[in-house]
């Protein structure tokens, strides 16, 4: 499978990036298991048994309707530098698991997001805690990759999907996603600052299925210089449309280029992603 091979190569590049953590212009962190240290937990988000549980469930494990939770790394991340004009290349890898009591009606989904420092939860349900029904403007200053399990007719494609969101819950680019209820999903998201290309790939190892979506996003025109990175998730507003939203592990690395070697590394990532996208077209 071309996409799985491509994803593995991107994971290797991501790990190479992480090994350069001694570099002064690189920030990286890894949660193999979660505790509350270094996390900002909002609303219903909790840590339990090493898992980051974004939305609420009852003691018997049944998800709660109308739940909203968010969790962000506690240290702000510099995405671009207004003085020099440089933009960070970054990558994140995480494993999540969504499980609905009724596999035919999960809701609403989970998203990885970059938000302004100090951002507070927004609307429940289909807005995934990141946006609200009254504001589709640039003032949101939010970029997200959503893993959307429920069709909201006002803005969603008809199928479950992975979408890239820029200041709005209406994705600028989507790809259909065969949601695997209760099965782990492994995600890798990369941003190449030399091309502005944001690429998100998801693999369900148990199903041997994989999905990819990409789009060019100029982060300097969307985000503030410093952001918080993390997750937001919601359940449906009625008990027949709910799911658990758990993140099992998470790594992140970002680096603002300051030398030729960094530029060569970015070019390598850019060429690899471009070839893979062409092969899958």
From Swiss-Prot:
Keywords: Antibiotic, Antimicrobial, Fungicide, Glycoprotein, Lectin. Glycosylated. Glycans are attached at residues 35, 82, 140. GO terms for molecular function: carbohydrate binding. GO terms for biological process: defense response to bacterium; defense response to fungus; killing of cells of another organism. Optimum pH is 7.4. No activity between pH 4.0 and pH 6.0, 80% activity at pH 8.0 and 20% activity at pH 9.0. The record marks 263-264 as: Cleavage. The keyword rRNA-binding does not apply. It comes from the Eukaryota. InterPro entries: ConA-like_dom_sf, L-lectin, Lectin_LegA_CS, Lectin_legB_Mn/Ca_BS, Legume_lectin_dom, Leguminous_Lectin. Activity stable between 4 and 40 degrees Celsius, declines at higher temperatures and is lost at 90 degrees Celsius. Tetramer of 2 alpha and 2 beta chains. D-galactose-binding lectin. Belongs to the leguminous lectin family. This is Lectin alpha chain. It comes from Lablab purpureus (Hyacinth bean).
């Amino acid at each position: 499978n071309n996409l799985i091979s491509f994803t593995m190569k991107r994971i290797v590049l991501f790990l190479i990036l992480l090994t350069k953590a001694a570099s002064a212009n690189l920030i990286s962190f890894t949660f193999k298991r979660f505790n509350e240290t270094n996390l900002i937990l909002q609303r219903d988000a909790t840590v339990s048994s090493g898992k980051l549980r974004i939305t609420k469930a009852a003691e018997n494990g049944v998800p709660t309707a109308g739940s909203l939770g968010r969790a962000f790394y506690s240290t702000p991340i510099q995405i671009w530098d207004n003085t020099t004009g440089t933009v960070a290349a970054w990558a994140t890898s995480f494993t999540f698991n969504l499980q609905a009591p009724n596999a035919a009606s999960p809701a609403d989904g989970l998203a990885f997001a970059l938000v302004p420092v100090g951002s507070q939860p927004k609307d429940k349900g289909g807005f995934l805690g990141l946006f609200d029904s009254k504001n589709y403007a640039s003032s949101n200053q939010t970029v997200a990759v959503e893993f959307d399990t429920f069709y909201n007719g006002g803005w969603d494609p008809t199928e479950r999907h992975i979408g890239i969101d820029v200041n709005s819950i209406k994705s600028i680019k989507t790809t259909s996603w065969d949601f695997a209820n209760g099965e782990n999903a492994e995600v890798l998201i990369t941003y190449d600052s030399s091309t502005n290309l944001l690429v998100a790939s998801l693999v369900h190892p148990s199903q041997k299925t994989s999905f990819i979506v990409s789009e060019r996003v100029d982060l300097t025109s969307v985000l503030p210089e410093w952001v918080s990175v993390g997750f937001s998730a919601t359940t449906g507003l009625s008990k027949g449309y709910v799911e658990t939203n758990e993140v099992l592990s998470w790594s992140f690395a970002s680096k603002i280029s300051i030398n030729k070697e960094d530029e060569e590394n970015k070019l390598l990532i850019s060429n690899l992603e471009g070839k893979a996208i062409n092969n899958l077209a």
